[in-house]
Amino acid sequence: MGGVVLAVGLVGCLLVLLPWKRLLPDGAEQRTIEHLPTLGMVLSWLPFFLLVQRFVVDDTTVAAVNASGGASMPLLYRVAATWSARSGPLLLWAGFTASLAWWWRAPMQGESPEVASRRVGLLGGFAALLMLLAVHLRPFAPTLPGTLRGELNPLLQTDLMVVHPPLVFCAYAYCLSIAATGISSIGQPDQGLLDRITIQARPAFVVTTLAIGLGGLWAYLILDWGGYWAWDPVETGSFLPWLALAVLAHARTVPRKVPGVVLRGAALLTGGLALFATLVTRAGGAWAASVHTFVVASEGSAPNDAFGRIVALAVDGSAGVEVMAYLLVLLVLAGWWLVDLSLAAGREAHPRWLVVDLAVPLIVAAAVLVEWSTTFTTVQPGVLGRVVPFGSAWVGLVLFPSLVMTGWPRADVRGKNGFARPFGVPVDWLIAGAIANLGGDVLLAVVWLCLFSPIAVSSAPTSNIPAAALGVTLALVSAWTELVPLYVAGLMLVPFLAPWLMMDDDASPEVDIHATLKRAPLWAGAGIAALMLVLTFTILLGSIDQIHFAAHEVYGSVLLASTSGALLLYSLRRESTTVRLTMLIGLLLVSAVGALLTPGLWGGDALEGLSNVVLRGHIAWLVVPTALVAVPHVFSEVLHSARRRSTTPWWRRVPVQAHVVHAGLLLLIVGHVMTTTLVDRGDPAHRITMLKDEPVEVDGWTYTFRDVRLIPGEDLTVGDGAVHVVIDVSDGSEWRGTAEPGMTRFDASGFPRSEVDVVRGATGDVVLIFDFTQAGDLMQTVAMEGEDAVDAVRVTVYRLPQSHAVWVGWGLMLLGMTGLSLSSRGKEKHLPAA
């Protein structure tokens, strides 16, 4: 039955993506045609709901259910077990993607029926690809005889895991819908493109923010991190599409018209980063995990770059096909961007729609052939370290059609070669190949090529300042994080600086301070988000074996401070240039003096180092003062915009909601510094040993171990038994509350779950985490001698002042983003469906 339902789901995706009005004869029944996409959308969900039903009834004849299900779990947890199976999220993602293709199936503003049908076809086609990948993973495969019963990962047996993963894949479906909009508009007029993207980006921003926030809340309450954010590769990967959406959301504020090619590039980037985030999550072991995942023989060695490890996964029959499919689509998106740049620079395709209609099958066919021919070579014992040369050739062949498919220059630009295309020679491609082979990271080389191409194909390269800024950031961060050798970083850097190094001195423009202060806040939204994106992505590429927490915090702090400064400048736009400059310079002086004289003022682990010269307190002084000063000014902007007379209700006014989002962001920045930057979670000083009824004082707070509670499995919602310790918490002489951190035992998996408890107060939270390495001895002592026999316990304690700012800020951002999405309702100008 499962195979039949999967086939039905695939047919449903096809019903959504096909342009029925063009395929069926003119005399076909109109009502029938209109219902076919709706029928397809419904059918696309059937495989997912059947898998959910199998988990709900605990059908152990299905291998996935036998591995992760459980009749004793609450109903919602059995539903959540669906996305613990590898195929479950794919079916969920396919359903969301097909639903969005169906929802926006009519031509949008400025979109012709032909372009709309291509957009819907691209999105529906990706849903079909996901369905095919799910078929390959066999979600309804029968349980083999003798297979032992498994158990859902204890960390997933929580309420938040019921809603967090579906929201993540819904967000990624939105990102792919935006990418399909960008692809379908290549070679077409730019009229209405920004409106079409914005209509989709605003709800995508809401869903992505909600998904990431709930993931952070899950980490805060369930994981033993003692915080909501740790720059873990999976959460960092999901942060990248959010940053791309931030770039799109601020496209309207840029103080000049954004070219269509840039909008399409940002749209493609959004979809590509959703795929990359999925790669980080599902390319098991590639990021910050055991490298043994990729070793297939004793004499083999794992590749030391992300791309090499992903390609090495091709040997895995289940994960390999899925991961390679995502990688291929990622490269195809990069190819479309390169083609669009060539078209914008004056080259032309023959025929025009060759770019969209034939690019994908040609590129995928070539890539599959090369992947088939090189996979066997790259995974042979002893040669895993030589993946990069094969990978470079593979990627080169995948992207090669992008270089040649656009034909010849148009007559009006013939003879005007691009900056890095002397006599038509693609020097930029040659440099990218050198970066891949010398630096050893093919993904980094592809990103470099995508950033440099706007300069390479342009006959006026100095007009591409944003691309140059992003490229310089990419090169510098690659050097700082030792992702590539220094000489390779130099090879990456010089081409971005070359146009300005070659420029005449008298061609340098004069700087107008007044105009700069006026325009800078308008550029900041998109610009800072883009710089943060490049920074985060580059550090993540280097985090395959360890998390570079310090790099994220130190380098990102400059951009966080710039964000606060830009919002403050915008709030002071009615003031004179002197007032604004005085405010900024004064804040910089306060930060500098404070960092030099009193870096430990902020408390916590402010005096702990993030590098040889940078303390955590230095970061706090750089970021927090400007953010604190900006908060009241931005809230005043909210009130000012809401009180302004208008026929539009205040809750549907874009300025009001945008200022609410910005106010929430500032609070979130302050909360992040206080609860993440200033807390050294690797410091053993946070682990304290408490003797029974003897208070232990740490940083002015007192913790007293009172009792031990042993909880049998029948009294638990999930788990086979638990041990909790009762601890009184007080601030000096004032009692703050009682915490009961502990550990829950899961016998089937043998995997204990740490139970975090939080004591909340007006000034912030105190997080207490039970050290479960003592759990076995403690349980045995209680069982044999009674609870009174336990006279000491170990607990990790993190005090997080101003932690409420994180959640209040997140809530305000969601509130404002929802208002922005509602302000777009009714503005979609649809034409009859294609």
What is each of the regions a protein language model found here?
Residues P89-L90, F96-T143, T147-G216:
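A conserved hydrophobic secondary-structure block that centers on an alpha-helix together
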